[in-house]
Design a protein with these regions (language model features):
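Lipid interaction determinants
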Residues: 15-114
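Sec-dependent bacterial lipoprotein signal peptides
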Residues: 1-15
């Protein structure tokens, strides 16, 4: 009988920790620690209108974002060594909560917090 009552409670708890990716659930600032620089963060700001901005990244300038199911596509401009190029990256959203975003691109997982 206890197991019968426990299963719905566990299901509800698991569902509350995870969100479906929607433009409104993704909008906001997402950051991660800068490797080798304790106390510094970098990341992206996803605006509700589909524009994107980089946070503390001078050579990687995000311009826009798009959501297709669980796939997040970011576009922008990469600047370095006197050259610049446009880029598009698509990642799978492995996990999304109010405070955590985990992206997977080609097996490389990146964790962000809000």
């Amino acid at each position: 009988m206890r197991l019968f009552l426990l299963l719905p409670a566990l299901s509800l708890a698991a569902a509350s920790c995870s969100m479906q990716p929607t433009p409104s659930s993704l909008s906001g600032s997402w950051t991660q620690p800068v490797p080798g620089q304790p106390g510094h963060v970098q990341g992206m700001q996803l605006l509700p209108d589909g524009r994107a901005r980089s946070i503390n990244m001078r050579t990687l300038l995000y311009r826009s974002w798009q959501l297709d199911g669980k796939r997040l596509t970011l576009t922008g401009k990469s600047i370095g060594n006197g050259n610049s190029s446009l880029f598009t990256t698509t990642s799978t959203i492995d996990r999304l909560s109010r405070t955590t975003l985990i992206l997977n691109r080609d097996g490389n997982r990146e964790a962000y917090t809000r």
